[in-house]
Amino acid sequence: NDSYWEGSDPNIQEYPVFKVDSSTYCILYIKFFTDKLFHSMIFDMASILSKKQQIKGTPGQVYVQLKQMIGQRFTEKYLFYLIMKGILTDKRYQIWTGEQLKQSYGDGMPDMIAIKAQRVFVFEFKDVQLSAKVKESGDFDTIISKINLELVQTEKGKPKGVTQIANVIEKRLEKLLPSNEKFKIYPVLVYTESSFDLEGINYYLNNKFREILSSRNIDDNFCIKDLVLVNLETLFMFDRAFRDHKLKFDVLINDFLSYKTNKIEHGSVPFNKFLFQRGKAKGYFYKSSGIVRET
């Protein structure tokens, strides 16, 4: 019905469900639907806490505080490691969590390091969100500026994301690795913001990463691979394939890096899409997670 949208500006991210009739609803996009459920629940909690003054601030300010608390206490400290445990199933991996690394080597370490033979995976996890205002701006400079602030460095010069990984490779990895051996270093940035799934984001951040590395003093024994962005939700979706040894993380990353260089048009393809294709080919699309069965 053309008149339905007359005078309106429909936004399926804000309204991901379409009412067909009094008893039938159509989910327009499942990711927007689940995001809406999750964030609406947090905002409802924020509104109640703000109204009762259990947390000071407007509902919007309390919402930001709650999101930070959930990220710090649950997503970063528990969920990230739980999912990665199911992904890195090969017993040959030597794995250190961020807490273990900090206790043994002090500040400045990544959220996880996994070593398998001469392959070293450096994981940095970022539970950040781009605001609707930024995502809907349609302005390249606005979006890139926010990505830089969240995943490169803050306005005050504090390292974030790719810069943190570069710092680890230059200054901290030598503490874990023998000095007389050669290693392949795989920088991996794990995220939760679905907008980072889009073509070109990984390409842009890898260029920033390479630019940062070019001014650093990197150990000659380190062969630094391209940066790979990985969506935590997608790993969760296909974790059963990893647990069943149908997918192997290190092999998948190497295959993806080779795929990117095969053709020029592959250069901007995100790892998320590559993993979807491999997971579906193995028959694991939308199969229940091993984490769900365990918990």
Where on the chain are the PLM-derived regions?
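Catalytic cores of nucleic-acid endonucleases
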Residues: 127-185
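Active-site beta-strand-loop-beta-strand hairpin of nuclease catalytic cores
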Residues: 114-132
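Well-ordered, non-membrane alpha-helical segments in soluble/globular domains
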Residues: 77, 159-170, 206-215
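A short acidic (Asp/Glu
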Residues: 108-110, 194-204
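Extended hydrophobic secondary-structure segments that form protein cores and membrane-embedded regions
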Residues: 185-192
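A short acidic/basic microdomain associated with nuclease active sites
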Residues: 85-108, 112-115
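Short secondary-structure boundary/capping segments
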Residues: 137-141, 201-209
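Interfaces and regulatory segments of ATP-dependent nucleotide/adenylate/phosphodiester-chemistry enzymes
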Residues: 1-89, 207, 215-295
